[in-house]
Amino acid sequence: MNTVFRLLGLALLAAPLAAAELEGVALDKRVQVDGEELQLNGAAVRTRVIFKVYVAGLYLPVRAATAQEAIEAKGPKRIVLVMLRDATAQQFVESIDAGLRANNSEGEIAAVKPQTDELMAMIRAVGEAKKGMRIVLDYVPREGTTLFVDGVAQGKPMAGRAFNQALLRIWLGEDPVQLDLKEALLGGPQ
């Protein structure tokens, strides 16, 4: 009987480390960014019309229940996008641009234009986002936001907390790309 309780206890301890899975895509419950452990705050599937486009995951040092808490959180952050279908670089660039414009003021957009231009150039250089491709945006306060594609850094970090906050607003802003995706990234149901 003690063995059963020990095994049950070990299973319960391991459960928080198990991956979350959406549409066959596994997302780790915890990740390391710049030596700091981040936890999966929420995950969701981005849809457009009837098409499932990508699985998104938001990682933060401390769980956040509101968009403001997530956007303003101190320390490293990570957004993971795993493609569920192919998308051209132009489609991806247009989607990011539309999300930035819908959720940031003209002044905020102007302030991060150099970083936005860098990100768009990196996306164009990568080319088509293929089904299964893992796109990661890691933010490290002293460095900036780094784009990774399938684990490979693309270019150098794009400086500034304001840029990272502008990007997060694409998914968490007042007019997010998808409302139920925002709610799920903040720990709610999708």
Predicted regions mapped to residue ranges:
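Sec-dependent signal peptide recognition
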Residues: N2-L10
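Mid-length scaffold segments of soluble, non-membrane domains
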Residues: A64-R142
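Cysteine/selenocysteine-centered motifs that mediate thiol-based redox chemistry or coordinate metal-sulfur cofactors
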Residues: L179-Q190
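Short strand-turn-strand beta-turns centered on an Asx-Gly dipeptide
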Residues: V149-V152
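Envelope-exposed proteins and targeting segments
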Residues: L27, E36, Y54-A56, G75-I79, ...
